């Protein structure tokens, strides 16, 4: 039996939409007949993303937006409403991952400060920018991108994990306050090398926390296969031993949450590779 397409004609606004999860999600939504608003702080990246996604005329627009500035987020929403008259789905995807130990505070503080503004306040800004509109139109869906780092404290992930735990709290609070009006989905991806998040890591050694007791075995595996010559069973999604996801795998699950009847809300999704070594 063919599944019904609930994504078609929905208006989807994505922050951080020019790369990673956001870009993959935008592409998949367009393929299913949605209308997309891509926002990103990088204007050149927006132009590149628009060129790379084949969309019908007037089905997609790109807007520069710094999510740390609530007025810019509100303006992006208003521009979206001018074009499409409604917003069905708000995806708060923009984020950074400045992993570092507390001992790194002198070099990490500025990155941590920005992380709080982007990962926490950016999500809050996205919520309040669409809240009144979704209430007025009678329905809507807010999708917040959290992380498995939000599940439990680990060394090196204190500030990043705290911002993502705060996202979980915002998501659940919004759900409680808007039942029957706004659907809320919280997405907790595992580590996904194909995104730009790793570029923000302050201290590369801080990734040890998420591996915990599996660190030694993981390092042995990498040392046994230098030059990224990792066996196929660890790199293909058709293998139970897959070590790491691609951004598209996460985007597929976000699409799943969007592609539901109006009365069905997928509240919380954890997406991980079946063979990943992360302890969270």
PLM region descriptions:
Residues 2-36:
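Canonical Rossmann dinucleotide-binding motif of NAD(H)/NADP(H)-dependent dehydrogenases/reductases
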Residues 32-49:
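Conserved glycine-rich Rossmann-like NAD(P)H-binding loop of the short-chain dehydrogenase/reductase
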Residues 43-44, 64-76, 109:
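The beta1-alpha1 cofactor-binding region of Rossmann-like NAD(H)/NADP(H)-dependent oxidoreductases
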Residues 101-116:
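Substrate-binding pocket helix/loop in short-chain dehydrogenase/reductase
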Residues 127, 163:
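Active-site helix of classical SDR
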Residues 147:
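Residue(s) in the substrate-gating loop at a strand-loop-helix junction
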Residues 176-264:
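SDR active-site lid
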């Amino acid at each position: 039996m063919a599944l019904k397409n609930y994504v078609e004609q929905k208006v989807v606004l994505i922050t951080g939409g020019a790369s990673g999860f956001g870009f993959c999600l935008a592409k998949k939504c367009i393929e299913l007949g949605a209308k997309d608003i891509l926002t990103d702080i990088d204007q050149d990246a927006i132009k590149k993303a628009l060129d790379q996604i084949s969309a019908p005329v007037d089905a997609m627009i790109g807007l520069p937006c710094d999510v740390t500035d609530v007025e810019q987020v509100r303006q992006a929403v208003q521009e979206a409403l001018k074009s499409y008259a409604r917003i069905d789905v708000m995806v708060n995807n923009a984020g950074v991952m400045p992993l570092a130990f507390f001992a790194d505070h002198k070099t990490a503080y500025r990155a941590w400060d920005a992380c709080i503004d982007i990962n926490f306040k950016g999500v809050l800004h996205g919520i309040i920018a669409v809240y009144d509109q979704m209430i007025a139109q009678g329905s809507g869906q807010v999708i917040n991108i959290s992380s498995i780092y939000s599940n439990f404290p680990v060394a090196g992930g204190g500030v990043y994990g705290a911002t993502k735990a705060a996202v979980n709290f915002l998501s659940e609070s919004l759900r409680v306050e808007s039942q029957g009006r706004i659907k809320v989905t919280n997405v907790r991806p595992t580590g996904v090398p194909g995104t730009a998040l790793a570029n923000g890591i302050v201290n590369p050694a801080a990734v040890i926390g998420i591996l915990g007791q599996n660190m030694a075995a993981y390092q042995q595996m990498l040392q046994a296969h230098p030059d990224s010559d990792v066996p196929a069973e660890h790199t293909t999604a058709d293998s139970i031993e897959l070590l790491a996801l691609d951004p598209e795998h996460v985007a597929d699950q976000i699409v799943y949450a969007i592609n539901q009847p109006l009365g069905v809300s997928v509240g919380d999704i954890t997406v991980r590779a079946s063979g990943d070594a992360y302890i969270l």
